[in-house]
Amino acid sequence: MPKTRRPDGPPRRVRPAARRGQLAHVLLVDGNIGIGGAPERLLARAAALLAPGGSVLVEAGPHPGEWWCGTVRAGAGPDVPWACVGADALRALAPAAGLAVYAVSERGARTFVELVA
């Protein structure tokens, strides 16, 4: 995880990034499934990082069947690629990444989907 010494400073890496097959769990919450606007690629990358028996925990979008890809803008910043994927849509996306739904859990208004290889 890159860190900076100052808020506007360049990041420095404090430890090597994870390699294929090294992680027990990958956590994609708070909308992180949308990073890059290609959830299928993000799931494939997450699956590749998993050690045998590992899982990917994804916070799904608020609408179960939703699968939206496009761009968003935060304030005056540039457009960035983003996606939103509901729990049912994750069930459809998971097999292409070699994953399957193991469990779905709701906590208040939030839905979490655990995927396993």
Regions found by a protein language model. Give the residues of each.
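S-adenosyl-L-methionine
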Residues: P2-G21
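A short glycine-rich, Lys/Arg-flanked "PGG" loop and its adjoining helix->strand segment in the class I
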Residues: E40-S55
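Conserved class I S-adenosyl-L-methionine
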Residues: S55-A76
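Short alpha-helix
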Residues: V80-V104
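Core SAM-dependent methyltransferase catalytic element
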Residues: A97-A117
